[in-house]
Design a protein with these regions (language model features):
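Non-catalytic DNA-binding core/recognition domains of DNA-processing enzymes
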Residues: 16-107, 199
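Conserved hydrophobic/aromatic "anchor" residues
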Residues: 13, 33-34, 99, 210-213, ...
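N-terminal DNA-binding module of tyrosine recombinases/phage integrases
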Residues: 1-17
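Short, basic (Lys/Arg/His-rich) helix/loop patches that form interaction surfaces
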Residues: 249-297
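Flexible interdomain linker/hinge and immediately adjacent N-terminus
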Residues: 104-137
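Short, charged phosphate-coordinating catalytic segments
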Residues: 155-178, 297
Length: 297
């Protein structure tokens, strides 16, 4: 907990905002930088006590300049504190405006410009991807390819964000995998909305193949209801006092980072996917979402 009342009030605001997982990580970055800026006495004294004063231009101007210089990084990069990237700078500005708007303050748009969205696949590419996945299902697949095929099929039906897909559980699937329940978490915050989405024949078949693989994995790990699970033994990444970490067996819940990594690796590993999948899962999501909206009109 921060020693500054303004940052403690910011923590409460972040909890109430209900932002999606990706946006929350970005907001937490800004929160940490603001706290470090206050610890350096780099902001006006009033910003220590009042959240509104912390989010006024008098405090945010110096904060943004200091943060962009790299001085407020929470860890060193190759022994130094280099300036943050333009993409990070733009994320920071967006988060600042989001926080101000949550308090009823107008957006500042402190310098910089919008980072253009990476291009999303066309509708024809989505159809070609579905055909490629169907070809995979017609033959033998490794566990990793089976999981990725099911994940991509679900994405083509739902246009789910990575965080929304990662938290899916087996009880979010309808009878015979004919539907999937997904909770929408708006990136900028707002009410969470859930919906049942009818699945395609491709998705039903892909989920059936994956659930057979998943069953054996989960039994070894003593059970979980999470839909996506790990395929290999790994560790939790937390070191104890002796420098050791807890070993996790295969079949443990796959977190969002692991899900995104499986997408990136699979895009390069399996024949046909590099030409059909964009670099990032989010680009695929936007393409599917746009296609769904076109179909609905």
């Amino acid at each position: 907990m921060s020693k500054f009342p303004s940052v403690r009030a910011l923590d409460q605001l972040l909890d109430d905002l209900g932002a999606g997982a990706a946006r929350r990580r970005q907001l937490d970055m800004v929160r940490g930088e603001l706290n470090r800026a206050l610890e350096r006495d780099a902001l006006p004294v009033g910003a220590r006590r009042s959240l509104r004063r912390l989010l006024e231009e008098e405090a945010l101007g110096p904060y943004v300049r200091l943060a962009e210089s790299g001085t407020l990084r929470h860890r060193r990069v190759e022994g130094g504190l280099p300036p943050t990237s333009e993409a990070t700078n733009e994320i920071r500005r967006r988060c600042v405006d989001l926080l101000r708007e949550a308090l009823g303050m107008p957006a500042l748009r402190l310098g910089g410009g919008e980072i253009p969205l990476q291009p999303a696949p066309e509708a024809g590419t989505l159809s070609a991807l579905a055909r490629q996945l169907d070809q995979y299902l017609a033959g033998a697949m490794s566990p990793a390819q089976t999981r990725l095929t099911a994940l991509l099929a679900v994405e083509l039906d739902t246009a789910g964000r990575s965080g929304e897909l990662a938290v899916l559980r087996t009880n979010d699937l309808g009878k015979d995998n004919a539907a999937v329940y997904i909770e929408r978490h708006p990136q900028g915050g707002g009410a969470v909305e859930g919906e049942w989405i009818e699945t395609s024949a491709l998705t039903r078949a892909a989920l059936g193949r994956w659930l057979d693989v998943r069953k054996d994995l989960v039994q070894r790990a003593h059970g979980t209801t999470r839909l996506w699970v790990s395929l290999w033994m790994n560790h939790d990444g937390v070191l104890d006092d002796d420098g050791h970490t807890t070993i996790r067996p295969a079949g443990m819940p796959l977190e969002e980072n692991g899900l995104v990594t499986s997408y990136r690796v699979g895009r390069l590993r399996y024949d046909g996917l590099r030409q059909l999948l964009p670099l990032k899962l989010e680009q695929l999501r936007r393409a599917v979402d746009a296609d769904r909206q076109r179909t609905a009109t």
